[in-house]
Amino acid sequence: MTDRYILAVESSCDETSVAILKNDNVLLTNIIASQVESHKRFGGVVPEVASRHHVEVITTCFDDALKEAQLEASDLTAVAVTYGPGLVGALLVGLAAAKAFAWANDLPLIPVNHMAGHLMAAREQGELEYPLMALLVSGGHTELVYVTEPGEYHIVGETRDDAVGEAYDKVGRVMGLPYPAGREIDQLAHQGTDTYHFPRAMMKEDHLEFSFSGLKSAFINLHHNAQQKGEELVLEDLCASFQAAVLDILLAKTKKALKQYPSKMLVVAGGVAANQGLRERLAEEITDIAVVIPPLRLCGDNAGMIALAAVVEYEKGHVAGLDLNAKPSLAFDSFHQQ
């Protein structure tokens, strides 16, 4: 059998990435050019800055990926690209590069949903069993997705306001922690105790919706009031208390989803899936079903996950024309509707 090589491009936010996947799940290379240092001084991602950085490095990422994989463009089978959701300017840079490369080398173009990429990153560890439940947690999304078969995604629950990663970054900013704050809050939480009481919105309700705005506001109010009164708060305990509330909500809703939807495994993916506290709670509390979490190198935004998702789309015959456009608000239920 002839080997299949898919080159994938990811540029939906602040990471420029090009990867090459061999056959079903062998990542030959996963080049990532991060912009985190450029955005730190702003306390978050600045869309215009992100787009400019993508333009500066994307050609080099293509060259480095082919060189590291020891392949020529003529060896490739297809090109995959994230077309949404994400920042429109950032998406357009990756799309333009992928379409130009596909056209120049007469290769089919595979459109990939960024969140499907996060979910399908779990494929690197082996074939997934369906139906499965997925908890997707990142800076822009918090979703429970029921996957009935490869490529068939159904959102069964999502946040009504802030995404969990967004909440981490906002409370981190209040505490004066550098962006992105998730990793540092996780580390500090392991050094503290759950001392301060924070609300756990809708945790006991049967539906699968999330809400983190109340928790975020309660945290900000506690911190502000303490400053006004000259009271000293213990940073480690603040982080431990905040993270305990977040994880209580995530675990409660995930358990409800598993009861409501027959599933053979649970996939937890997205940038927040790198959180050590979340991984520990999952291992402790969900023991009657296989829990699959991508390795740390595939939790953040990267083209490797886009390539892993592209295999499913390619095998279903989902290819796009060169008129494929960015869809910054793309949802799973609008997937394939180019």
Swiss-Prot record:
Substrate binds at residues 136-140, 169, 182, 186, 275. The keyword Heme does not apply. Coiled coil: none annotated. Keywords: Acyltransferase, Cytoplasm, Iron, Metal-binding, Transferase, tRNA processing. SUPFAM superfamilies: Actin-like ATPase domain (SSF53067). It is an enzyme of class 2 (transferase). Pfam families: TsaD. Belongs to the KAE1 / TsaD family. Required for the formation of a threonylcarbamoyl group on adenosine at position 37 (t(6)A37) in tRNAs that read codons beginning with adenine. Is involved in the transfer of the threonylcarbamoyl moiety of threonylcarbamoyl-AMP (TC-AMP) to the N6 group of A37, together with TsaE and TsaB. TsaD likely plays a direct catalytic role in this reaction. This is tRNA N6-adenosine threonylcarbamoyltransferase.
